[in-house]
Each structure stands twice: as structure tokens, then as C-alpha cells.
Amino acid sequence: MKFVDEVEIRVEAGDGGAGIVSFRREKYIPEGGPDGGDGGDGGSVYLQADENLNTLIDYQFERFHRADRGTNGRSRNCTGKKSDDLIIMVPVGTRIMDVDTQEGLGDLTQHGQKILVAKGGFHGLGNARFKSSTNRAPRQKTLGTEGEVRNLKLELLLLADVGLLGLPNAGKSTFIRSVSAAKPKVADYPFTTLIPNLGVVRPEANKSFVIADIPGLIEGASDGAGLGIQFLKHLERCRILLHIIDVMPVDGSNPVDNAFAIVNELHQYSPKLAEKPRWLVFNKIDLLPADEAKALCEKIAQELGETENIYSISAINKSNTQPLIHDVMTLLESMPKEKFVETTDEEVEFKWDTYHQKAAKKSDDDDDWDEWNEDDYDVEVVYER
């Protein structure tokens, strides 16, 4: 299935049903009075996270989603039926943003988590609501308010503990194959990896973490070179970054320059992402004698100004990968996930709330129902026995 991590959709909540004007008409009950019922509330639209989904491809072709309208009221004080809410299922890790206001509505980071994105319209009132001691035959009613309409941008951000960084052909996919059951494509040409891949690493029987492999970056990626930096967003929720460095690039380039290019692209994309713990992992040391490989790695680390969290491995034959995995697991256990979950106490203001508050205020300011007179509307009410 094609991996799609960004789509735009339009959601429309249902309008509220209208109230009606009706009067009770029964034998032996003269002047029965008003009995017009209220309408029903319109359906709201929710987004809910589902762990069984892993792509947003369905919403590339199904962009419009509308909840049903509430039904109108009926006579005998019968209230209209409230419409059912519309629930749209999305993958866990989906971020929701209003396209028009650029307002962040929330992140769905847990299975079953649900967020209201468009509130249904409020029901209209029937004429029974307007009866009073001075207005016994009211002919007023209100229509239901309109449901909220939003244009939403959905972004899928992978939920991983560890993210892999590096140039194309640095050995990221080979590394994730060697430490997990994931089987991303591996070949001897650049940009073999075109979409992010996830793998579950189990250092011990009851311990595990998720590692994410994204397409390689190149110098100028922030300006659109290569596949760009669009996939870096999948590392935003990672707690540790592993910077895979090829000590023997096939093009003869300098590993130090290559490493600085990746760090520069990281800073241009997000200074916050660049501040995450980043470990250097020198790969392909099997291409050199042990002494030469050790000396080269130390030289590169010195030029990069790194003195801690440096590892030398050979992903293809799994050499020195286990110590790295155990150290990663140890660090993750000391870094609770809750520390990295972005939370906000800011309440989302829905357009329906603003509309209804204004309508209620206007109704209070212009409240002249008690002064209503049938003669003002040239209506004659005749009651027959």
C-alpha cells in the first residue's frame, strides 16, 4: 500500500433541526395552546486514532466528510432526533491543523483517542418555548444554527523512540534490518529508501523500542535537493537520534563534511529537533583493518568535536551492534515518554461557540416577546368549541 503522510480534507458538521409552530387540537380541549417541538442537534465530526491504520491514503480520494442534519421538531411537543456524530478513523500519530486559521487542533498519539474537530449546530426552538402569560398563542420559532465547517490538514508523524539520520547509502536500512525484523529494501544506489520504515528492536525478552528509518538527506535538502527534508517530521517524536556515518563513502567524499551537512540540514529544519540527543554511529568499519578503522573513527570524531556516545559498527555483519542497542535501551529507560509528549492546555475555540454566544446575546438584547401582539402581524386567532 502506498504511504501517504499528509492530506487535506473538508469536514462539515450537521445543521441543527428547526423548531415548528403548532397548536394542540383535540376534541373537548378548546384553546389547547402551543405544542410545537424543538428540532434536533446536528451531528458533530470527530477524528479517532486507530492502531490498525498506517497511512492516510484513503483521504486522498475521499476529501469531503459531512455529518447529518438534525431533524425538525413536530407537533405534540415532539423533539426532533439528534443526528449521529460522524467519526473519521485515522492512524495513531496524526496531527490535525485548521488550514484557514493555521490553528493546531491536537495530536492523536494513543489508540482510541478522539478529538472534536467540527461541532454540530444547535437545535431550533418550537413555539411552545415562547408561551407566556401575555403571549398564549406564540407564532415564533427559531431555526437551528449551522454546523461548523473546517478545512483540515492531517499530518501523520511516526511514533518511534529512535530515529536514524544519514546520507543516502550510509547503511541506515542495513542497520535496521540487522537489529530488528524489519526488511526495508537495500541496494547499492542512492535513495533506495523512499518512505519511512519502522522496526521493533528487542534487546531483551521484556524490553523493546521502536526505531524509524527515513530516506537519506543530502546537502541542500532544505532547498529541495534530493527528496527534501519533508521526512524529518517523522523524527520529531523520537527521543534519540542515531547519526549513521559512512567511513568509506563510495564517491570518495569526506565523512566529516558529510556529517556537518546532515547537522546543518537538521538545524535548518528545526532547532528543537537538532537539540535532541544525537549519537554518532560509524558504519562499514569492516571495509578497513581494525587498527585503521579505529584511528579513522577517532579522527572523524575529533574533527566533529564529539567525545561521547560514539560507536563503530558494521551493520551488514552485525558487528558491535548489540552494545549500541543495549546502551540505547538503557538511555530510553531513563527518559520517560511523558517528558517528550507535547501537551497544551489551550482550549480550542470552535466557530459554533462564538456564533451561538453572539446569537444568545442578541436574543437577550432584543427580548420583546412579552410585547408581541397578534394584531401587529394581521393574524386573527379563532378558537372553536
Curated annotation (Swiss-Prot):
Cystine pairings recorded for this chain: none
GO-annotated molecular function: GTP binding; GTPase activity; magnesium ion binding
Boundaries of every Obg domain copy: 1-159
Subunit structure, interactors included: Monomer.
UniProt superkingdom: Bacteria
Cellular component terms (Gene Ontology): cytoplasm
Entries under PANTHER family matching the protein: DEVELOPMENTALLY REGULATED GTP-BINDING PROTEIN-RELATED, MITOCHONDRIAL RIBOSOME-ASSOCIATED GTPASE 2
Pfam family, any one: MMR_HSR1
Record keywords: Cytoplasm, GTP-binding, Hydrolase, Magnesium, Metal-binding, Nucleotide-binding
The protein, known as: GTPase Obg
Cofactor: Mg(2+)
Cross-referenced InterPro entries: G_OBG, GTP-bd, GTP-bd_Obg/CgtA, GTP1-OBG_CS, GTP1_OBG_dom, GTP1_OBG_dom_sf, OBG_GTPase, P-loop_NTPase
Protein's job: An essential GTPase which binds GTP, GDP and possibly (p)ppGpp with moderate affinity, with high nucleotide exchange rates and a fairly low GTP hydrolysis rate. Plays a role in control of the cell cycle, stress response, ribosome biogenesis and in those bacteria that undergo differentiation, in morphogenesis control.
Residues that, per the record, bind GTP: 166-173, 191-195, 213-216, 283-286, 314-316
Keyword Iron in record: no
GO biological process: ribosome biogenesis
Keyword Lipoprotein belongs to the record: no
HAMAP family linked: GTPase_Obg
UniProt main location, coarse: cytoplasm
Family of the protein in this entry: Belongs to the TRAFAC class OBG-HflX-like GTPase superfamily. OBG GTPase family.
Subcellular location per the Swiss-Prot or TrEMBL entry: Cytoplasm
Domain OBG-type G intervals: 160-333
Residues where Mg(2+) binds: 173, 193
EC number from the UniProt entry: 3.6.5.-
